[in-house]
């Protein structure tokens, strides 16, 4: 089956396969329950929710506990069996000590069948950083027009502050395509996920302004989202932040620097 066909199936299927439902039930049973705060900030209209990735915790939280209809952007490589090992090692484990790389490369191959199955059958939209991104935008606009919210984890390797990493900013272009189709300004909603507190917090929406140049809007929206997510994180009780990168746990930062942390 072609990737685009799989994407359509993922977004339109009425009932997930039994195996996927069993996997999801198992994860829900084993994973801690997440308390969601700030859901009153979700607009009455569909929106794009932008959150910190916090490794696997972000996707798990969005899949199990987001309180409204949603689909989630997913790296297209994680939906292709042959591409999972290389992408998984680079994205999850490449910063581990070099002496252990052989082990994590084995893990990358071992996880490939299950990972590609899960991400293909979850409510996801594949993201590719090439010409296929236009297909991603098209499917995203369609999902929004069907009444779904869209969850995006746009962080990449460059650190922004102690809470969050810099964003790959092209996701903001969804707002331009959505405005052309609907005539509506798309809201972007910040969300901070704190696995150590078993909590996720939703902040106030930031609206796309179609009258401003796109380059300026990308920068403005990304900066406001990053700062809002940071403020949401800092306002919570003192805790250890689970960063985007899978670095040694002893290097995990605190939500308020220079304070003692108990969680």
Regions found by a protein language model. Name each.
Residues 44-129:
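Catalytic core of membrane glycerolipid acyltransferases/transacylases, capturing the structured
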Residues 27, 57, 61, 173-174:
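Short amphipathic alpha-helical face segments that pack within enzyme cores
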Residues 22-46:
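A short, well-structured juxtamembrane/interface segment
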Residues 2-7, 129-263:
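Non-catalytic C-terminal accessory region of glycerolipid acyltransferases
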């Amino acid at each position: 089956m072609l990737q685009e066909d799989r994407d359509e199936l993922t977004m339109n299927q009425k009932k997930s396969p039994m195996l996927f439902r069993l996997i999801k039930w198992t994860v829900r049973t084993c994973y801690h329950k997440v308390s969601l705060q700030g859901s009153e900030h979700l607009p009455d209209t569909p929106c794009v929710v932008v959150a910190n990735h916090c490794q696997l915790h972000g996707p798990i939280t969005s899949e199990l506990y987001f309180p409204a209809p949603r689909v989630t952007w997913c790296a297209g490589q994680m939906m292709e069996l042959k591409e999972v090992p290389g992408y998984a090692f680079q994205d999850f484990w490449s910063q581990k000590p070099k002496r252990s790389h052989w082990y994590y490369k084995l893990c990358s191959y071992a996880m490939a069948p299950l990972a590609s199955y899960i991400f293909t059958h979850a409510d996801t939209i594949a993201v590719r950083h090439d010409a296929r991104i236009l297909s991603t935008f098209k499917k995203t606009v369609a999902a929004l027009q069907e009444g779904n919210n869209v969850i995006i984890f746009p962080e990449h390797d460059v650190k922004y502050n102690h809470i969050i990493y810099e964003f790959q900013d092209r996701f903001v272009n969804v707002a331009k395509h959505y405005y052309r189709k609907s005539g509506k300004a798309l809201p972007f909603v910040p969300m901070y996920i704190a696995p150590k507190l078993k909590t996720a917090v939703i902040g106030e929406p930031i609206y796309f302004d179609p009258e401003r140049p796109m380059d300026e809007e990308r920068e403005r929206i990304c900066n406001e989202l990053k700062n809002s997510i940071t403020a949401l994180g800092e306002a919570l009780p003192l805790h250890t932040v689970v960063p985007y990168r899978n670095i040694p746990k002893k290097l995990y930062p605190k939500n308020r620097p220079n304070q003692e942390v108990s969680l």
